Amino acid sequence: VGFVIVTFQEQGESEYKNCELDKNQRQCVQYALKARPLRRYIPKNPYQYQIWYVVTSSYFEYLMFFLIMLNTICLGMQHYNQSAEMNHVSDILNVAFTVLFTLEMILKLMAFKAKGYFGDPWNVFDFLIVIGSIIDVILSEIDDPDDNSRVSITFFRLFRVMRLVKLLSRGEGVRTLLWTFIKSFQALPYVALLIVMLFFIYAVIGMQMFGKIAMVDGTQINRNNNFQTFPQAVLLLFRCATGEAWQEILLDCSYGKRCDPESDYAEGEEYTCGTGFAYFY
């Protein structure tokens, strides 16, 4: 797969072999043509400006980064069959972090107002995390373990873990790395289409060559892994591509295997299914 991706990128670069600009220079020109000025909201109210100055400062960013890391460490300290005291401390810490992140949301709402706050997708994500965390705290307080009609709060406890994703919005370096990761997926659809075509071709060939092999439990060609139907053939090929017991599948598809009772084999040819082509396949 890596070789296919590298070859695809090289073929794309070959289209510009006669261009006087290299790849970085072309990207700079495209960026200059597509760039748009960024609008930054600065409040005119002096009290609102003071709050805005605090929440946009690097010290505030470092503080929230520290709180997120501390929250992550606290989540990592939880373990199976922990004591009641540990559960109590975890609940208290969860409430404390929820209050702090709620305070951050309120300060940003006061600094940017609703329009400016919700104009940033990261702020919308933070807002959803805070709301989910508040619901988690409320349900944790009203949930009674001895009550048969207790509320399931497993889903809302996922918001505790989702706070870690907030780290992606902290720091220019992290955002640059995330943007680079997203941009690397631009060529992925074409590579994925090529891989799908290869799987399709190989699945059809496998159905023709190994589709008559009997499904025997205890072997690699069974009711779950076989070439008798197209979906099963694709799944089996995917298993081979991941390297899971591919050599055993190879041997079970070689010549001399028992034929499926419903296949059209002649009398005395019960063990003539499979082919040596499996070694090349």
Swiss-Prot record:
GO-annotated biological processes: calcium ion transmembrane transport; cellular response to caffeine; muscle contraction; release of sequestered calcium ion into cytosol
Tree of life domain: Eukaryota
Calcium in keyword set: yes
Motif interval(s): Selectivity filter of repeat IV: 242-245
Annotated intramembrane regions: 233-251
Region of interest (Phenylalkylamine binding), residue spans: 270-281
Molecular function via GO: calmodulin binding; voltage-gated calcium channel activity
PTM description: Both the minor and major forms are phosphorylated in vitro by PKA. Phosphorylation by PKA activates the calcium channel.
Region ranges (Dihydropyridine binding): 1-17, 258-281
Reactions catalysed, as given in the entry: Ca(2+)(in) = Ca(2+)(out)
Residues carrying sugar: N81
Description of activity control: Channel activity is blocked by dihydropyridines (DHP), phenylalkylamines, and by benzothiazepines.
Location in or out of the cell: Cell membrane, Sarcolemma, T-tubule
Transmembrane regions listed in the UniProt entry: 59-80, 89-110, 121-140, 153-171, 190-210
Disulfide bond residue pairs: C259-C273
Domain topic, free-text comment: Each of the four internal repeats contains five hydrophobic transmembrane segments (S1, S2, S3, S5, S6) and one positively charged transmembrane segment (S4). S4 segments probably represent the voltage-sensor and are characterized by a series of positively charged amino acids at every third position.
Stated role: Pore-forming, alpha-1S subunit of the voltage-gated calcium channel that gives rise to L-type calcium currents in skeletal muscle. Calcium channels containing the alpha-1S subunit play an important role in excitation-contraction coupling in skeletal muscle via their interaction with RYR1, which triggers Ca(2+) release from the sarcplasmic reticulum and ultimately results in muscle contraction. Long-lasting (L-type) calcium channels belong to the 'high-voltage activated' (HVA) group.
Official protein name in the record: Voltage-dependent L-type calcium channel subunit alpha-1S
Annotated source species: Gallus gallus
